[in-house]
């Protein structure tokens, strides 16, 4: 029997070797593009290994995430996604703290986020001044240049985003610079397809990735 759409999606067939904190960060990175995430639950108990729950604020966000990310290769294993059996019942049983106020527990979070929003307004203004020119000036290249990446970005996270595109070769991070990276493809056509698809992809709610062709 199919589950009715709700804010919580259930994911299984996850790689059991990934540490819990890294798993949660990576899930957040690929699912935050669909809408505000209230919580991610991933436990390493024997019964719950290879499974996780992502709780969105809106049902529409959960529906888009389920439809778009079904079968997405995540740490070399295709994700299997379904709606949770009921809005938060399973999560409540797992966490033991989620039952009474599943949606009221999280709303205080926007308060500290107000500073981030101010930063968000400042940062794009400086980035946008230089980037549009870069995008028009650089001719096609099989190597892409990524900017505006958040501090928690790592090679595995970017590889998961880009390896779904044909011709993906490698991700190259820049030492002592968390905000930029290079991604190489076999041909310029392949790199352009990835560039068009992931332009503006939100790795976190405050960081929309900017992609240009690298200088030749």
Curated annotation (Swiss-Prot):
Compositionally biased intervals (Polar residues): 126-142
Molecular function GO terms recorded: identical protein binding; mRNA binding; poly(U) RNA binding; pre-mRNA intronic pyrimidine-rich binding; snRNA stem-loop binding; U1 snRNA binding; U2 snRNA binding
RRM domain residues: 7-86, 142-216
GO cellular component: catalytic step 2 spliceosome; nucleus; precatalytic spliceosome; protein-containing complex; ribonucleoprotein complex; small nuclear ribonucleoprotein complex; spliceosomal complex; U1 snRNP
Subcellular location(s) per record: Nucleus
PANTHER family: U1 SMALL NUCLEAR RIBONUCLEOPROTEIN A/U2 SMALL NUCLEAR RIBONUCLEOPROTEIN B
SUPFAM superfamilies assigned: RNA-binding domain, RBD
Consequence of changing residue 49 to H: In allele SNF1621; sterile
Keywords: mRNA processing, mRNA splicing, Nucleus, Repeat, Ribonucleoprotein, RNA-binding, Spliceosome
Protein name: U1 small nuclear ribonucleoprotein A
Primary role: Binds stem loop II of U1 snRNA. It is the first snRNP to interact with pre-mRNA. This interaction is required for the subsequent binding of U2 snRNP and the U4/U6/U5 tri-snRNP. Plays a role in regulating sex-lethal splicing.
Annotated segments matching region Disordered: 97-142
GO biological process: female germ-line sex determination; mRNA splicing, via spliceosome; oogenesis; primary sex determination, soma; regulation of alternative mRNA splicing, via spliceosome; RNA splicing
Quaternary context: Belongs to the spliceosome where it is associated with snRNP U1. Interacts with the SMN complex.
